[in-house]
Amino acid sequence: VSPVPVSLRISAHAKVNLFLRVLAREDDGFHSLETLFCLLSLADELEAERMEGAGVTLEVSGAETGPAQDNLAVRAANMVLDGTGHPFGVRLKLTKRIPVRSGLGGGSSDGAAALLAVNALAGNPVPRHELLQFAARLGSDVPFFLSGAPLALAWGHGERLLRLPPLPAAPGLLLLPVRGGDITALGTLMVPPP
């Protein structure tokens, strides 16, 4: 039995959707989708450390990500702590390299990394299938990142995944607009009218 770590570091990779079909909005507010996720080498870095007391703190470098309580890594950490009843706090240090609100899944990847990290800090009491349920509650991209798959076909709310073998490594060029925007607004343009 290996000892429970007091801190660890996880790379939280970006992704691209090689295709994306946004379907009808469901009663829960999420859209059904069909997509092909592909993991990229570009990654944020998440450090998680146990601390005395309770609660989750977040320190971010590299980009502004908004209020800590809205951050998916903080929400994910709280899900694991609440779900296990472990009476310790967590300090998260996030180094952002994935452009914020770019559609590359940075926040979702950070959330998946936090689920894995905090579960490890607690001695891995949450089984994989429950972590996937937590991931699905956080967002449509989070289950893919938690799965560890390099390539996956996803549908439903992103929680249904078919793992595929990785594509051959190839250089690529990804262009992002100079002026940031809200990628979620693009999703509303892709939904077919009722």
Which residues fall in each region the model found?
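ATP-dependent small-molecule kinase catalytic core of the GHMP/sugar-kinase superfamily
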Residues: 3-11, 19-21, 25-32, 124-194
